[in-house]
Structures are given as structure tokens and as C-alpha cells.
């Protein structure tokens, strides 16, 4: 292991001791914002420090085995232990390299999921509903909470547009590479000739903005309109102006929320979504610049990029960014996304390691 890497790991080990001491102080418990930040930092430090401790123990075991070589009776066993120990050290060092990669500060956050029907009309809207169900199932499997923020239903089912909040530790880190165009190939229920149709939806995954510090929204930059909420097909579902439309004048971003009977709650939801969209806008500009510099395949943040195809007749899902094809479409549509998300994260980490080169 390089001395620079060892030095960094030792610093992190000392920092974990400091954080534990700070968390034990009564003043920290009284300040919830500080307590949350320190708890989040501890959760990030602990796996790195544990892996480094394991590495140090393996080094000690290897040194002991080297000493045993001098004893003829122990030589054969020592050689086996040295071989195993070296392999273990190599594996642990690779794991530590990944753990030391620059972390996306948003990875631990909850997220807003926005799905929009694209080309394909009614079939695209139906697929929007399928995608929402897929992500909701995945979230449930991981113990995350899903809350519908805004929906524009289609008359035949599904959604023209739907926004959901997925609340859970690390939700954004697992799903951030889902942003992009998702294409579906299947025979629609309304197709009498049995022909395969192709349609598409756009998915946007946005980290939840920290209300305290991430995004500052000037009230003077907002136009807030209220109107009567309506259901699918345009029928009015209540008698009061509970629906809220917020326009952010400098950017032209518009957010509508009408799912709640309370105008106040609809406004709160709309402001949350607007803050997430503004944060996402900043993120995408930065990601686009970074991706251009390092020719990144995975984390470009380009929403127009076709990232995945769901081919129902063949039962396959293909992610075009990493050339991964899985013949388990039904399981994936039921929320079994772990293999896909894991492969995308691994590819992104490989890109980061390649970009850092000798620095790690």
C-alpha cells in the first residue's frame, strides 16, 4: 500500500474517534442539525475504518507467518498462510481504494422521482405507470417510503407525468443513474394485429434539497397561482382552489401540485419539488462539464440520452451505457433492480479510479 493512502486511512481512523467523542457530548444531542451531520459522517467513516483495521490485522498475520518460515516443522503451513494473506491484502486494498473515492455528498439523501411519458402516446403513459410501480417496489424492498407528490393521469391508465418522493437513507446514491430515456418494446393491449410498438418515457432522479442550506429561493422570484384541482379527464374533484402552481421566473421552471385537499400542503410539496429541480439543474450542469472532461459513460446527467430498453417479447432489459443485457424482465419490473444499479455504480467507480490514476 502506498504511504499516501496509508496516511489518509490513518487520518480517517483518528477522525472517527473524534466524531464519536463529539456525538457523546450533550451539546450535540441538543442541536439536531449538527447531530444529523455528525451521524451521517460517522456512517461514511465506519466502513472505511473497519476495512483498514482488517487490512492491518492481515498485515500482522502475514508478518507472523513470515517468521514461522524459519521453523522447518511450520514451514508448509506458513507458506499456505502467506499465500492466503497476500491474496487477502490485495483484495482489501482494492476495496479500500473504492472506499476512498470522492463521495457524492448527495448519495445519502432522499430523492424526487419524475417520470414523463414521451413518444408513444397512451402506451408511453401506461409504461410511465409501470416504471413508477417498478421503482416503488424496489423502494419498498429496501424499506424506503414512497409519497406521491404530483400526478397527471392518462385517461387509459398510467401517467402523462408523475412525481414521487422516495424517502430513505442512500436512496439517491442507489438510483441516481436511472435518469434518462427508457424505451419499451411490446405489443399494446389495444393492438389487434399483434404488432410490437416502441415508446419511451423520460426519468429524472433528483436529490432532495436541504431546506436550510442547499438552495436559496427568493420569494420575489416566484409567481404562485391557485386553481381548482381536477382528476383524470378534467373533472373537478373539489370546490375550493386547493391546487397550486409555482413558477420560478428566472429559470421558467413550473411546478404544480393538486393531490392534497389542503392548499397549504400542496404549496409545501410544490416548493420541495421546485427546490429539488433547482438543485438538480446545478448538478446536471456540473455533471455535464465533468463528463465531457473525463468522457464518462454513466454519470453524464443527460436526460435525452437513451439509457435502457425493455423488450417484452424477448423478456430482456438492456442498459446501453454499460452494454449489460439481463433476461429477467419480469423480475426487474417487479422491482428487482439490484443487479442493474450495482453494475452502474461499479462502472462509475471504475471510471473514477481510472480518472484518479496514481493518486489512489
Swiss-Prot record:
Modification sites for N5-methylglutamine? 235
An example Pfam family from this entry, by short name, is RF-1
Task: Report keywords, A-Z.
Answer: Cytoplasm, Methylation, Protein biosynthesis
Q: Where in the cell is it found?
A: Cytoplasm
Q: How is it modified after translation?
A: Methylated by PrmC. Methylation increases the termination efficiency of RF1.
Q: Cite the GO molecular-function annotations of the record.
A: translation release factor activity, codon specific
Query: Record's InterPro entries?
Result: PCRF, Pep_chain_release_fac_I, Pep_chain_release_fac_I_sf, Prokaryotic/Mito_RF, RF-1
Region (Disordered) location: 284-303
Write out the transmembrane intervals: none
Listed under GO cellular component are: cytoplasm
Family membership: Belongs to the prokaryotic/mitochondrial release factor family.
- Any idea what job this protein has? Peptide chain release factor 1 directs the termination of translation in response to the peptide chain termination codons UAG and UAA.
Supply the name of the protein: Peptide chain release factor 1
Source organism per entry reads Bordetella petrii (strain ATCC BAA-461 / DSM 12804 / CCUG 43448)
Gene giving rise to this polypeptide: prfA
